[in-house]
Amino acid sequence: MKYLFSIIILLSMGWTTDSSFIFSEKTKLDPCPNSPNCVSTQETRKRKRMRPILFTESSDLAIEKLERMLASKSRVTLVEKKGNYLHYEFKTKIGKFIDDVEFLFDEETKQIHFRSASRKGYGDFGKNKRRMKKIRKEYEK
């Protein structure tokens, strides 16, 4: 009976788990929506595109550096860390709106790609772009 139960558990784990997803690294961020409240380094539309953050150390050290930098900021929460990918929530001071900021570290090109987008509303008065310029400047100094 124990043997049968073990087999059922193992089979159900196989049906609910996609191991290729678990062990693969993210290589691309989602595109920005048509609304003006999003910027990304991988965006094809010029008005939404920003240049990536550059790093010289290994991607592991670059991830640690960015994590330390963002940990010192208020209203910033790490939501997910998976391989070369980080996802943060930034809560705005006024209105307590949440913006999603994602980082993707490319070891080969020594670039940190990012996407910063407001969860709600249509416009952001340029907040996402200003935030990412500030983060890039602080990281690269």
Residue positions per predicted region:
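Sec-dependent N-terminal signal peptides
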Residues: L4-M13
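Ser/Thr-rich, low-complexity intrinsically disordered terminal regions
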Residues: G14-K141
